[in-house]
Amino acid sequence: MLYLVGLGLSDETDITVKGLEVVKKASRVYLEAYTSILLVEQSVLESYYGRSITVADREMVESNSEEILRNAQNEDVAFLVVGDPFGATTHTDLVLRARELEIPVRTVPNASIMSGIGACGLQLYNFGQTVSMVFFTDTWKPASFYDRIKENRQIGLHTLVLVDIKVKEQSLENMARGRLVYEPPRYMTVGQCAQQMLEIEEERKEGVYAKDSLAIGAARVGGRTEKFVAGTLEELCSTDEELGPPLHSLVLLGRRTHELELDYVRQFAVDKEKWDKIWNAEYGKQL
C-alpha cells in the first residue's frame, strides 16, 4: 500500500500518532522535498522516526515515480509530505499513477498552511481562492493570481498567497546544455511577494488592490518562532527583516471583515493608527 502521510507545518513532532505508526512499519520511506520544507533537517526526522528517509525531489516524483511505487502492491511505502498530503497537485498525480497500477492508497492528513493561517486572526470561512506567487524574471511575469484575487475581492473575501520556493532547480542555461547543475535554494519573502503584486497592479490598473490595501505577512506558521506582521502592501514590502527566515506567506484582506478580526489582527500592525484609519474607511463593510 502507498501511504501519503502529512507531516504538519513545523518540526518532527508535528506528525500524527497514526502517521508515525505508518512510518515505523513501512518498508520504504520517502520525503517529498520541493513543494515545501519543514523547519528541521532530515537527520532530525530520521532520529525521531527511527527510520532512514529517501528524499524525493521534483525529478523523482514527476519523472521517476515508478521507483516510489516499486512493489507497493506487496509492501507498505510511506510518502511524507510537509503540511497535508493534498496541498499540491503533484501528490494527486502520484495517487492516480498508483491507481493505474492497482496499488491501494491511504492518506494520513495533517495541518497545512491552509488551516494554520487562521492563527493570524482572520476567520477561515472568510477566505476565498488561494493563489500562488512565483519568482518573476525579466521575461516571465505570470499574473493569473491577479484575476483570482479580483474575484475574491469582488465578494469581500480574504486571499491567501502562497509564495514560491526553489529547491534543486536548474538555470535555463544548464537545462539547455543538459547539465545537472542546480541553483542554490531560494525562498520568496513577503516583501518580494508584495512588490510583485504591486507591480502587476501597476501594469493592469484595474484597482483590484493598492499600496494602501491591508495585508498580513506570516512566517513559519505553526512553528515555535511563528511571526505575523500586519500593514499595507507598501509597508509589507519592507518588513522581511522583522518577519525573519522562511517560510513566508501573505494574506490580502477582503473588505467583508468582522470586528473580532480587527481586534485580533491589530496587535500585529506596523502602524496601528494608520491601520485603524484604513480599516474604518474601507473594511468591515457588508457587500
UniProtKB/Swiss-Prot annotation:
Enumerate the Pfam families for this protein. Answer: TP_methylase (PF00590)
Q: Which GO terms describe its cellular component?
A: cytoplasm
- Which catalysed reactions does the entry list for this protein? 2-[(3S)-amino-3-carboxypropyl]-L-histidyl-[translation elongation factor 2] + 4 S-adenosyl-L-methionine = diphthine methyl ester-[translation elongation factor 2] + 4 S-adenosyl-L-homocysteine + 3 H(+)
SUPFAM superfamilies associated with the record: Tetrapyrrole methylase
Q: What compartments host this protein?
A: Cytoplasm
Q: What is its main location?
A: cytoplasm
Recorded metabolic or biological pathway in which this protein acts: Protein modification; peptidyl-diphthamide biosynthesis
Domain of life where this protein originates: Eukaryota
Q: What GO MF annotations does this protein's record show?
A: diphthine methyl ester synthase activity
Q: Does the keyword Cell inner membrane apply?
A: no
> What EC designation does it have?
2.1.1.314
Amino acids binding S-adenosyl-L-methionine: L9, D84, G87, S112, I113, V163, V221, H248
GO BP terms in the entry: methylation; protein histidyl modification to diphthamide
Q: Which UniProt keywords apply?
A: Cytoplasm, Methyltransferase, S-adenosyl-L-methionine, Transferase
Entry similarity comment: Belongs to the diphthine synthase family.
Function per UniProt: S-adenosyl-L-methionine-dependent methyltransferase that catalyzes four methylations of the modified target histidine residue in translation elongation factor 2 (EF-2), to form an intermediate called diphthine methyl ester. The four successive methylation reactions represent the second step of diphthamide biosynthesis.
**What protein does this entry describe?**
Diphthine methyl ester synthase
What gene name is listed for this protein? DPH5
